[in-house]
Every structure is written in C-alpha cells, then in structure tokens.
Amino acid sequence: MRITAQPGIMDIALYQGGASQIDGQAEPLKLSSNENPSGCSPAASAKVAETALDLHRYPSTDHSALRMAIGQVHGLDAGRIICGVGSDELLTLLAMAFAGPGDEVLYTEHGFSMYRIFALSAGATPVVAPEKDRTVDIDAIIDRLTPATRLVYIANPANPTGTAIGLEALRRLAQSVPPTSLLVLDGAYAEFFEGYDGGASLVDEFDNVVMTRTFSKLYGLGGLRVGWAYATQEVIDVLNRVRGPFNLSSVALAGAEAAVNDRAFVETCLQENAAQRVRLMGGLNQLGIACDPSHANFVLARFADEAEALAADAHLKSEGILVRIVKGYGFPEALRITVGRADDVTRVLDALARFKGVS
C-alpha cells in the first residue's frame, strides 16, 4: 500500500498564472496579471523598508492595526474583519470550514478557476451555473441551489470578463440562498466598479453573506499577498479558528496598512484606470475586436475564433507585449488585457492595428 491523497485532490489541475517573460525579450510589457501599472503607494514602499529592519520580531497575530485601518476607510466594524494571505487564503478557509464530503460548492461557468479547486480540496462537489452573455445569471444560480449547497462563490466584477451585476441583483440572490449556505462575494476587483460597495451592505443585511477583498490589484501589493474578508462575527470566529496564527508577515501588514491609508494614491489610480479602460475598449471596437463593457482593470478582447486569438497573442509577444490567454476559463477565442498606463494602451492598440492590417 502507498499513501494517497484525499478523493478529488488529483482531479485538480495546477493553476497557471499570467506569463512574465518572453524568450529573447529582457523587459516585456506585462499586461497578463491585472497588476497596478503604477506599482504601489510610495508610503507603502517606505513602510515596508522600515519594517524590514525588525524581521527578527514576530508579527501581530490579530492584525488589529490593519483591521482598524480597513474599517475606518470603509466604514466597517473592524471586529468583523479578518485578514489573510491574499483573499485566496480566506476563500480557501471558507471552503475548509463550511464545506465537505456530500456538500456542494456553486459558482458560475466563467468564474475564478480556483473555486473548483477550493471545492475539491474540501472534498465537496463543484457545481457550475451557466452565465448569460458572459455575465453572472442570478436565475441560473438560484435554479441550482439544493439542500446540499454550502457555498456560493460570485466574483463581482468577474474575472476574466470584467462584467458586473448590481446590488439589487445580488440582494435577490442573497434572499434566495438558504440560511444553511454562505454567499461569498469575491471582490478582488470591486474598487474598480464605480458605486459598488463590494457587498458590505448585504453583509450587514444578511447573516450568511461574506465579502472578500485583496490588496493585490488596486493597491499594487501582489508581492506581499494580503487580503481581507468582512462577515458576521460568527463567521469570522470560525475562520479565525482555522487560519494560522502568524499567517501575515510584519512587512505585509505594515505595507497594507500604509497602502489603505494613502487615499490620494488610490484615487489617482482609479481615475487613470477608468480613463485608460475607456481608451482600450474604444480602440478595440474600432479595430473590430469585440469586448464587453468592463468594470475592472482589464478588458476581455474577443476575436473571431481561437486561431485568431492565438495569432494575435503571438503577434503581441513579437512586439514585447504579454497578455493572458483565457482558454482555461472557457474563452478560447479571447485574450484578457490588463489596463496599463496611457503609453501602454497606445502600444497595445498600435500592435493590434498592425496585426489586423489597419494603417
């Protein structure tokens, strides 16, 4: 006999992140991972450098300073906030703590690829609801709720489509999710969706709604891996019992606290993203490349078929530009393009114009 993994584990395909290198190119333009093209707040960088002088000290285990900062900025109860190693850790802990063999984890067909992995890792059964026009379909999700449903993961705005649904639609879903299930609103890109509170108001309205956020996108701290969740005190208490006591480093905590407090930097990044997103979408449309209105920091460019998408990707690589192939998300005919700075957007559109043979 040999030791074997739990059922479902070997059904998990390894996660493939956005490419970072092009053979023969020293510094490609990386638009494959939805990173902040402006980097992170200078205040965060300075705080990280300062904190690095005390690396022999253990970090805070309750993350109180960061939770207080998040609560103050967003008007939330800091006691109902938990911090994790990216929002990924918290999404994983939710599956670990609330789902298991015989349970179902529900998500949409083009949702974050890790949702299936979270379900299988917990021994639960993944259940997929179809989308409508690349957008979350509330009715399709409701139709697939069963007594076995324990978690419903919704990315809003969605990755890789950039589409989003409003609070009223989410409220209707929350009203339909039974009290024995958790509705998890994955808000990795929530800040880019103007007028959306990430679901905070729904968390306050319903006992079984959880929202998550990350510092990896808008705040430009992907290298530090910091995320947070907001839920009822009861759910937070459960998650705190299964997370590691020193899950976040002192450097990560300090950098995230400085970043969330630098509102001027945040507002500048949001304004720049909104402006360049409009430019990118408009430029793609002028080239005859379809794309849905995006509410995130990326645009899903849809080509005629998979062959054209792969050819476009190869052409962009030849010009030193990295974007994301999203066949694994069910879009073989599409490329996901991170919204960059003004000159980045110009470079992408010019390269695609040459690919299309447009002068």
Curated annotation (Swiss-Prot):
Pathway: Amino-acid biosynthesis; L-histidine biosynthesis; L-histidine from 5-phospho-alpha-D-ribose 1-diphosphate: step 7/9
Entries under SUPFAM superfamilies matching the protein: PLP-dependent transferases
One BP term from GO: L-histidine biosynthetic process
Reaction it catalyzes: L-histidinol phosphate + 2-oxoglutarate = 3-(imidazol-4-yl)-2-oxopropyl phosphate + L-glutamate
Gene3D superfamilies listed in its UniProt record: Aspartate Aminotransferase, domain 1, Type I PLP-dependent aspartate aminotransferase-like (Major domain)
Family matches, as Pfam families: Aminotran_1_2
GO MF annotations, alphabetized: histidinol-phosphate transaminase activity; pyridoxal phosphate binding
Signal peptide: none
Top-level taxon of origin: Bacteria
InterPro entries registered for this protein in UniProt: Aminotransferase_I/II_large, HisP_aminotrans, HistidinolP_aminotransfase, PyrdxlP-dep_Trfase, PyrdxlP-dep_Trfase_major, PyrdxlP-dep_Trfase_small
E.C. no: 2.6.1.9
Keyword Amino-acid biosynthesis: yes
Subunit architecture: Homodimer.
Family the entry assigns: Belongs to the class-II pyridoxal-phosphate-dependent aminotransferase family. Histidinol-phosphate aminotransferase subfamily.
Protein name: Histidinol-phosphate aminotransferase
The species this protein was found in: Roseobacter denitrificans (strain ATCC 33942 / OCh 114) (Erythrobacter sp. (strain OCh 114))
Gene that this sequence comes from: hisC
